[in-house]
Swiss-Prot record:
Species of origin: Homo sapiens (Human)
Domain JmjC: 1498-1721
Protein name as catalogued: Lysine-specific demethylase 3B
Motif (LXXLL motif): 1293-1297
Domain of life the protein comes from: Eukaryota
Disease: Diets-Jongmans syndrome: An autosomal dominant disorder characterized by varying degrees of intellectual disability, developmental delay, short stature, and characteristic facial features such as a wide mouth, a pointed chin, long ears and a low columella.
Tissue: Ubiquitous. Highly expressed in placenta, skeletal muscle, kidney, heart and liver.
UniProt free text on domains: Leu-Xaa-Xaa-Leu-Leu (LXXLL) motifs are known to mediate the association with nuclear receptors.
Modified residues (N6-acetyllysine): 361
Length: 1761
């Protein structure tokens, strides 16, 4: 099993010295291998076995290891120089496997024949014999050594299942040996990598030079980054500094320590194990980043899947299991994997399809983490040493071992560690995913914590290691060049061979050579030696060759290996030499390659770059000054990537031979070109050609370099890599990586977007992978044909995925990753132009429900680990430029500014730290928060740094809006292709309902810009995936303009800034700490003065104003009425008519204007003639004078247009250039005219008939030929200004229904009905099938909404009229859709739909919904699986969970009760918990399932509920009318549920004054479904009490009838009030509170506090004093209650109920969401509703953006009409 640590310390080792090997020729082993029986010849050699106890050496030639040989006395243990002439073969412990065994085994004196026996494989570190494909194995227990001809008969040992193997169960000695081995490895992992600390534990330290061998002591301190530990020696009391990667340290149990020669026996301390498990689990919940794969819920599964999480952990059990599992047993030397891979990176493998998202709030920011189980393939991020000749990086983490110069102290060494970036590639056991981890980071560069986490991943990595061994040699210790990329993320793209051909990847590390020379880091002996060139015949090579079916591929592969070995830099070993074609596991076709498992490239740096890049090759993207123009659009951040031509394909392209026909062999071709490109000169030239940060545009990636190399066939995978990788080497890996692959491995999404289809890279990639069923990429067919950016991504990313994984490695992260966080995703997506699939659709794209979007996105972040990426997996942000000595040197010389690409702590600790970084040390959950440090940093990708002439790092400034790039812009502008889940009609409807709020937003932002002082520069804060930017004062989500402190990043929203600035300074000082909006202090306690803050915007450039432009243009073109602030301000006097008879009048038009004439206001004040053709069959009315403040000409003539109206657009006044932020205000008047021309003009002509009826009913009489257009026009009219709800005398409804044609009073036609039509209408010219009833309903609804009376007496007088109107309304709606089964409750005021699955429900539902009325849908329970929702089912499944209960009678909280206690008393009163007086309590479960865990905890119930929710258009997460679906997954997804509400019934008379849920309101719409009603048994019947409660609750007769006639089970009594009445209710409650002597603090609200239940007395008082009447609704089993946003409501359970609610955001009620968000700002910071989780402004923006984009895409229809 691979040792947990990357260092060889603690590993088993086999040595063959020259004197013992002289008798045999060096070729013997190879010959033996060819003959198929290499065993005997090798076995007879004098092999020396032992354990590595220490390591030393400052340069590769001096690398030495201290070996404790088996069976020798103390004096015979000695130091062995790894590269000494006498060392012929040096093999290091690899994976634990099941190996075939022919000879019987002697067990307890009995010989037993067993076919498979646990054995350790070994990986060559030095191989002068050329073992080739020979696999050395040492059987456990008797330690018999065997040499197998290949790895075909080996199967990876998997702790989860193999620990139960019969052999182990029967033989205790063998079982103990296996457990001891696993324990050793786990302990090494704990010592060597974070985030584990062994502080306070007893340890024993090996003393190579001492007489006693072991020294005992207690760890007094362990550095979380360098891992150096200070040990207090027990005997002497002195403090020793020890590096566990250089000297063997073992944990001791309380029992006396013992030394056991080769291995430690069960040394693992239980504490250590628990600690580790707790750490892994802990992280899970907080930050389920892909990296946390093993966390939390996932961890539960892990145990099942993998056996014990821990056990597999470093054991390679899991890690190495990849290649050996199932089909994987391709015989790859997967065994070695372990050895190669940084074993410690164990990532528990979780069910691939599982993904958990958590939203955690930290310091005002909410981060989303997704627990996507990483595919377990994540490569270890630590730096393994590169293995010589491509062998697996032996102890991958040796990299951890710092370069130790001879004179350096251990501490120095610790810090200087260079992780030779060994490529740890693991063939993931998961279906063939092979990952090459770019763990090129120097150990020093990667915070150990990361390593630790990575190390966890390494388990998976171990699988990767196979790949590594297969040719991905670890890049050597180029310490100086910390691989920036994924820092070891498993991102490296996994290689898949399509036709079972293994892919060989050579991972060269040559680029690092120079760097090595420059830096001490590179000196780490061990790493370097690892990198030294060894004969290419390593047995792994042979294996890979044998695996490859294609001889040509084999040859090329060999060549590549050879060239690598010979051509690599001198001190280094050829990393790729032994490339085995991706272990079979990785390559075999049968294996599925889950998209997630594929490593994603970070757009900036292809994985391959990692290993092989010369220091220069890999320039930090950010180095380049934003202003530099480059061939490719550069990200402002990416400043200066050295343009070394090293595009991964550069050299390779030219050299690749056509033989690479099999995609799998691609790498081999690339390899050859490698060495050459490494020369610094070459690299420089190469660099010039390709910026590292390649555009995601695949076409671009391919261009040039790939050019010739790619063959249409599917040639080299390498071509697929990001073109940007600067070093040729990278190309090797690249092949595997998808150019656009960089993001969340878990999103499986089509790989190739239409835009990319021509891209050879993509083609190749898709060809290679497309055939795999699980394939990493979906086939092109998945793509919609319209050019979607390959990344439908942005929008689509699931936040989950975005997880913060990136955060973790803040320090070590390289920019490549950086990009991943922000730019790269956007870039990719921008480049491809794909808009992105809504989050909700993402899961559907990939086979495993995993999403590859990120892959496409190019986020380096999610990279490959599909599943359970190790928590700390390196997949974080890439390493900072400042960690690379060569780059720092260049930056100092050039004096160029660069972007801060890491957290303040890691990048610029001596400069001002942002708030997040300053608080880092105080975090409660340190390990978890570590992950976020980089991404959560306020200055990450925001602040610009620069070196002064003296080399001192200083702040140069911040990014400006002009430095945004197309990729960043892509997130904020409509996609060129159609957005998913939104059609033409929906777009118009959204614009009609939400457009005004959007305009309000824009106006607000413009006002904010006016507040910016002339001398101030506006900065640009790029949106960071998975981070919700929040105001530090009121915690509202920051939408765009805000003000930021340059020193600490403190940010305030526009409202708080305005409030503070407008307050006199004296008043501000007096407020002190009691100020409602407390402004936090700056770094040194100074207060934040508004004038010192820096104005900052989030939306790049002028995107916001451009969308505003498009909104007005679209409204004009499509005839969508507007009532937005911008129009009303400019045309107020002209456009706002008086109201008559409930309808708004058309401004500037007298009653006869309806004669079909259109009026237009010309921008210049002159008349603008407009002709509006109308259908010939519509009679025209004579035009009359038009009254207007400005002269207007109207043309009363109407021309025939085949029933299609074509409005002639009035000339537009000159407008400012589009670039002007305010230019769209310029022609508001003209646009307004256009809108009216489109809608009202023709309508007027149609309706005209002497202007008699505003609705022109005459034109609809039976004999009239009605234009199909007419109804649509009418609907458009209704979309008009919702001006006034006031009505003058009479009711237009009554007049309409009771009067004959032409008898209604004449009124202007521009009506202001306050709600849009049921069928959103397209502009004039588009035919509609709607008919009279369709808009008759609008009229009816309008009347009902506007029928108001000022006081109770008036209401009483009008009772008769109201009843008539209700009947008429019911009649109208019945006519509207007679096929929708429904009835009316609450005296005709509440719609009840009877068939939840009727697809037409939305039509009638919308009419009531847009008026703010609740709606009831019955019968949902008939669709649900009833057995899932029974109390006993919950009790059985979750009974042991601890929960908090609330006593409904007194609101007391009862903590830490088993949930079983609650469920047992659900229907049996005698089993209920009792209060102090002995009475059974009425309880409700508090927040269960907790937080957002419903989906994760109860997946089956989640699916059952979501599939059967009524009105799916609104309620489903991807519903077309659910605006929350429009929020790109790039952002933190709002928590919309589902949430469960479980409570007993309040069944006594005293309980009628108490509520189960007190009066409150929600910021979003919700549907609440009654899934179970439990009628309690015992202590008397309560039916009569329940009926009395219903009667006193004001329920109507129809409802009561349901109980008597239908025998239905009533569950709960609801009282819901209209949102518009909330203020009146608030006023009453304040009044009652004062009467009762209660205080009313300003930061509290009687409704938001949920402290009141309106009993019968209060409800009566509310009606009498304020005229407010609500809806009394009895919710029966299966009833779904729809509650509008902002509507106050309360619930009283009649019986025990289980209810489940899902929130949504409907277009009709966005205005309430908008208003409530502002209300919540003023609540106290501790208030549950205080935080703005809905992000309503962002939702409005993106909904409008998508709607406008869709309308633009359909403009051709307008042209045709």
């Amino acid at each position: 099993m691979a040792d947990a640590a990357a260092s060889p310390v603690g590993k088993r080792l086999l040595l063959l010295f020259a004197d013992t090997a002289a008798s045999a020729s060096a070729s013997a082993p190879a010959a033996a291998a060819a003959s198929g029986d290499p065993g005997p010849a090798l076995r007879t050699r004098a092999w020396r076995a032992g354990t590595v106890r220490a390591m030393s050496g400052a340069v590769p030639q001096d690398l030495a290891i201290f070996v404790e040989f088996d069976g020798c006395n103390w004096k015979q243990h000695s130091w062995v120089k790894v590269h000494a002439e006498e060392v012929i073969v040096l093999l290091l412990e690899g994976s634990l496997v099941w190996a075939p065994r022919e000879d019987p085994v002697l067990l307890q004196g009995i010989r037993v024949s067993i076919a498979q026996w646990p054995a350790l494989t070994f990986t060559p570190l030095v191989d002068k014999l050329g073992l080739g494909s020979v696999v050395p194995v040492e059987y456990l227990l008797d330690r018999e050594l065997r040499f197998l001809s290949d790895a075909n008969g080996l199967h990876l040992f998997q702790m989860g299942t193999d620990s139960q193997n019969q052999i182990l169960l029967e033989h205790a000695a063998l079982r103990e040996t296996v457990n001891a081995l696993i324990s050793d490895q786990k302990l090494q992992e704990i010592f060597s990598r974070g985030p584990y600390s062994v502080q306070g534990h007893r340890v024993k330290i090996y003393q190579p030079e001492g007489e006693e061998g072991w020294l005992y002591g207690v760890v007094s301190h362990q550095d979380s980054i360098t891992r150096l530990m200070e040990v207090s020696v027990t005997e002497s009391g002195e403090i020793k500094s020890v590096d566990p990667r250089l000297i063997h340290v073992m944990l001791m149990d309380n029992s006396a320590p013992q030394s056991e020669g080769g291995t430690l026996k069960a040394v693992k301390s239980s504490k250590g194990k628990k600690k580790r498990e707790s750490i892994e689990g802990k992280d899970g919940r907080r930050r389920k980043s892909a990296s946390d794969s093993g966390c939390d819920p996932a961890s539960k599964k892990l145990k099942g899947d993998r056996g014990e999480v821990d056990s597999n952990g470093s054991d390679g059990g899991e890690a190495s299991r990849g290649p050996w599992k199932g089909g994987n047993a391709s015989g790859e030397p997967g065994l070695d994997q372990r050895a190669k891979q940084p074993p410690s990176t164990f990532v528990p493998q979780i069910n691939r399809n599982i993904r958990f998202a958590t939203y955690t709030k930290e310091n005002g920011r909410t981060l989303v983490v997704q627990d996507e189980p990483v595919g377990g393939d994540t490569p270890a991020s630590f730096t393994p040493y590169s293995t010589a000749t491509g062998q697996t990086p032996l102890a991958p983490e040796v990299g951890g071992a710092e370069n130790k110069e001879a004179g350096k102290t251990l501490e120095q060494v610790g810090q200087g560690i260079v992780a030779s970036a060994a490529v740890v590639t693991t063939a993931s056991s998961t279906p063939n995913t092979v990952r090459i981890s770019d763990t090129g980071l120097a150990a020093g560069t990667v915070p150990e914590k990361q390593k630790g986490s990575r190390s966890q991943a390494s388990g998976e990595n171990s699988r990767n290691s196979i790949l590594a061994s297969s040719g991905f040699g670890a890049p050597l210790p180029s310490s100086s060049q910390p691989l920036t990329f994924g820092s070891g993320r498993s991102q490296s793209n996994g290689v898949l061979a399509t036709e079972n051909k293994p892919l060989g990847f050579s991972f060269g590390c040559s680029s690092a050579q120079e760097a090595q020379k420059d830096t001490d880091l590179s000196k780490n002996l061990f790493f370097q030696c690892m990198s030294q060139t060894l004969p290419t015949s390593n047995y792994f090579t042979t294996v890979s060759e044998s695996l490859a079916d294609d001889s040509s591929s084999r040859d090329s592969f060999k060549q590549s290996l050879e060239s690598l070995s010979s051509g690599l830099c001198k001190g280094r070993s050829v990393l790729g030499t032994d490339t085995k074609p991706g272990s079979k596991a990785g390559s075999s076709v049968d294996r599925k390659v889950p998209a997630e498992s594929m490593p994603t490239l970070t757009p900036a740096f292809p994985r391959s770059l990692l290993n092989a890049r010369t220091p220069e090759n890999h320039e930090n993207l950010f180095l380049q000054p934003p202003k530099l123009s480059r061939e490719e659009p550069s990200n402002p951040f990416l400043a200066f990537v050295e343009k070394v031509e090293h595009s991964p394909f550069s050299s390779f392209a030219s050299q690749a031979s056509g033989s690479s026909s099999s995609a799998t062999t691609v790498t081999s071709k690339v390899a050859p070109s490698w060495p050459e490109s490494h020369s610094s000169a070459d690299s420089a030239s190469l660099a010039k050609k390709k910026p590292l940060f390649i555009t995601t545009d695949s076409s671009k990636l391919v261009s040039g370099v790939l050019g010739s190399a790619l063959t249409s066939g599917g040639p080299s995978l390498s071509a697929m890599g990001n073109g940007r990788s600067s070093s040729p080497t990278s190309s090797l890996t690249q092949p595997i990586e998808m150019p656009t692959l960089s993001s969340s491995p878990t999103e499986e999404r089509p790989t190739v977007g239409p835009g990319q289809q021509d891209n050879p890279l993509l083609k190749t990639f898709s060809n290679v992978f497309g055939r795999h069923s699980g394939g990493f990429l979906s086939s092109p067919a998945d793509f919609s044909q319209e050019n979607k950016a390959p990344f439908e991504a942005v929008k689509r990313f699931s936040l989950d995925e975005r997880s913060l994984a990136c955060r973790q490695d803040s320090d070590s992260s390289t920019n490549s990753d950086l990009s991943d966080l922000s730019d790269s995703e956007e870039q990719l997506q921008a480049k491809t132009g794909l808009k992105g699939i809504p989050e909700h659709l993402m899961g559907k794209l990939g086979p495993n429900g995993e999403r590859s979007a990120e892959l496409l996105l190019g986020k380096s972040k999610g990279k490959q680990a599909p599943k359970g990426r190790p928590r700390t997996a390196p997949l974080k942000v890439g390493q900072s430029v400042l960690k690379d000595v060569s780059k720092v040197k260049k930056l100092k010389q050039s004096g160029e500014p660069f972007l801060q690409d890491g957290s303040c702590i890691n990048v610029a600790p001596h400069l001002h730290k942002c708030r997040e970084c300053r608080l880092e040390r105080y975090r409660k959950f340190k390990e978890q928060e570590q992950d976020d440090s980089t991404v959560a940093c306020r200055f990450f990708h925001f602040r610009r740094l620069i070196f002064t002439r003296k080399g001192v790092l200083r702040v140069e400034g911040f990014l400006s809006p002009q430095q945004s790039d197309p990729d960043a812009m892509n997130l904020w502008i409509p996609s060129s292709s159609l957005a998913e889940g939104i059609d033409l009609e929906t777009s118009k409807y959204i614009l009609a309902n939400v457009g005004d709020q959007f305009c309000q937003l824009v106006m607000s932002e413009k006002e904010a810009m006016m507040m910016v002082e002339p001398h101030q520069k506006v900065a640009w804060k790029r949106a960071v995936r998975g981070v919700r930017e929040m105001c530090d004062v009121c915690e509202t989500t920051l939408f765009n303009i805000h003000w930021v402190c340059r020193k600490c990043g403190f940010g305030v929203c526009l409202d708080c800034y305005r409030l503070r600035k407008s307050r006199p300074r004296s008043e501000t000082e007096e407020m002190g700490d009691e100020e409602v909006f407390s402004w936090l202090k700056c770094a040194k306690g100074q207060s934040h003065e508004p004038e010192n803050l820096m104005p900052t915007q989030i939306i790049p450039g002028t995107a916001l104003y451009n969308i505003g432009d498009m909104v007005h243009a679209a409204r004009g073109k499509w005839g969508i009425k507007a009532n937005c602030p911008c129009i009303s301000r400019q045309n107020k006097s002209v456009l706002r008519p008086a109201v008559t008879n409930g309808m708004s009048q058309l401004p500037s038009i007298n009653p006869s204007a309806s004669s079909g004439n259109e009026t237009t206001f010309s921008g210049g004040g002159g008349p603008a003639p407009v002709t509006t053709p109308e259908p010939d069959h519509v009679p025209k009315a004579d035009s009359t004078d038009i009254r207007s403040e400005e002269p207007l000409k109207t043309d009363s003539s109407a021309s025939n247009s085949n029933s299609e109206l074509k409005a002639i657009r009035p000339p537009c006044p000159d407008t400012a250039p589009p670039s002007s932020a305010l230019h769209w205000l310029a022609d508001l008047a003209t646009q307004k005219a256009k809108e009216e021309t489109k809608e009202a003009g023709s309508l007027r002509s149609v309706l005209n008939k002497e202007s008699h009826s505003p609705f022109g009913l005459d034109s609809f009489n039976s004999t009239a030929k009605v234009s199909p257009l007419t109804p649509k026009l009418f609907n458009s009219l209704l979309l008009g200004p919702t001006a006034s709800n006031n009505k003058t005398e009479g009711s237009s409804l009554r007049d309409l229904l009771h009067s004959g044609p032409g008898k209604l009073p004449q009124t202007p036609l521009d009506t202001g009905i306050p709600f849009p039509p049921v069928f959103s209408t397209s502009s004039a010219g588009v035919k509609s099938k709607a008919s009279l009833p369709n808009f008759l309903d609008h009229i009816i609804a309008s009347v009902v909404e506007n029928k108001k009376t000022s006081d109770a007496s008036k209401r009483a007088c009008n009772l008769t009229d109201t009843q008539k109107e209700v009947k008429e309304m019911v009649m109208g709606l019945n006519v509207l859709d007679p096929h929708t089964s429904h009835s009316w409750l609450c005296d005709g005021r509440l719609l009840c739909l009877h068939d939840p699955s009727n697809k037409n429900n939305w039509k009638i539902f919308r009419e009531c919904w847009k008026q703010g009325q609740p709606v009831l849908v019955s019968g949902v329970h008939k669709k649900l699986k009833s057995e899932l929702w029974k109390p006993e089912a919950f009790s059985q499944e979750f009974g042991d969970q601890d929960v908090d209960l609330v006593n409904c009678r007194n609101c007391a909280i009862i903590s830490d009760v088993k949930v079983r206690d609650f469920w047992d008393g659900f229907e049996i009163i005698c089993k209920r918990l009792r209060s102090e007086d002995g009475q059974p309590m009425v309880l409700k479960l508090k927040d269960w399932p907790p937080g957002e865990d419903f989906r994760d905890m109860m997946p089956t119930r989640f699916e059952d509920l979501m599939e059967n929710l009524p009105l799916p258009e609104y309620t489903k997460r991807d519903g077309r009318l659910n605006l929350a679906s429009r929020l790109p997954s790039y952002f933190v997804r709002p928590d919309l549920g589902p949430k469960m509400y479980n409570a007993y019934g309040l069944i006594t008379a005293e309980d009628r004054r108490v509520g189960t849920t007190n009066l409150h309101l929600d910021v979003s719409d919700a549907v609440n479904v009654m899934v179970y009603v439990g009628i309690p048994i015992g202590e008397g019947a309560h039916d009569e009490e329940v009926l009395k409660t219903i009667d006193e609750g004001d329920a109507d007769e129809v409802t009561k009838q349901r109980i008597h006639d239908g025998k239905e089970k009533p569950g709960a009594l609801w009282h819901i009030y209209a949102a518009k009445d909330a203020e009146k209710i608030r006023e009453l409650l304040r009044k009652v509170g004062e009467e009762q002597g209660q205080e009313n603090p300003p930061d509290h609200d009687p409704i938001h506090d949920q402290s009141w239940y309106l009993d019968q007395t209060l409800r009566k008082r509310l009606y009498e004093e304020y005229g407010v009447q609500g809806w009394a609704i009895v919710q029966f089993l299966g009833d779904a209650v729809f509650i509008p946003a902002g509507a106050p409501h309360q619930v009283h359970n009649l019986y025990s109920c289980i209810k489940v609610a899902e929130d949504f955001v409907s277009p009709e009620h966005v205005k309430h969401c908008f208003r409530l968000t502002q209300e919540f700002r003023h609540l106290s910071n501790t208030h549950t509703n205080h935080e703005d989780k809905l992000q309503v402004k962002n939702i409005i923006y993106h909904a409008v953006k998508d709607a406008v984009g869709t309308l633009k895409a359909h403009e051709s229809k307008l042209a045709r009409s």
